[in-house]
Regions:
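Thiamine diphosphate
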Residues: 1-172
Length: 172
């Protein structure tokens, strides 16, 4: 879903694409415009990036080709949030090809949930946490004051004391 003058870009992969679309609606409440992108395969995007990189290295006289990801995200100032129902390392594969601030959300750890909704909240890949990550990325770029982000987080019911999902399995 393209958005002219987007403040942030959201990448959703698999079932989490729906959460990214919901996050876009949540962000509207805070006057934040978001583009939503679907990543059907971070593996293929990485391979394309490596292929283009190799081609450029082998042809220094013609080394200006860009990978598909670089073409899509050529504006280096717009934060990108990638969310997937795989481990974060899955979406981290394209980090070298994104020059913008890049934040990844994934299901690292051991989940113990009775529903998909609870599982996505547990791993922080639901629409609320995608929104939180987008708001934080914009805060780091000085789009919001500390007071504003605190108010946004209260409204989103962000629990700063929630344990890291990737460490919960070993806690007693």
């Amino acid at each position: 879903i393209e958005e002219e003058n987007a403040d942030v870009r959201l990448i959703g992969s698999g079932a989490i694409l729906r959460e990214a679309i919901k996050a876009r609606e949540i962000l509207k409440k805070y006057n934040i415009t978001a583009e939503v992108w679907s990543a059907t395969s971070f593996n293929l995007l990485r391979k394309n990036g490596m292929e283009v990189e190799r081609k450029n290295h082998l042809s220094p006289d013609n080394d200006s080709e860009l990978s598909y990801v670089e073409q899509c995200f050529s504006d280096n100032d717009i934060p990108v949030i990638a969310a997937t129902d795989y481990m974060r390392s899955y979406s981290e594969q394209i980090r070298p090809y994104i020059k913008s601030p890049y934040h990844t959300l994934g299901t690292d750890g051991y989940g113990r949930s009775d529903s998909r909704e609870t599982l996505r909240d547990f791993f922080e890949v639901d629409s609320t946490n995608i929104s939180r990550s987008a708001i934080y990325a914009l805060y780091k770029k000085n789009h919001f004051s500390k007071e504003q982000i605190i108010d946004f987080y209260k409204d989103l019911e962000v629990d700063a004391n929630k344990p890291n999902p990737w460490e919960v399995w070993c806690q007693k």
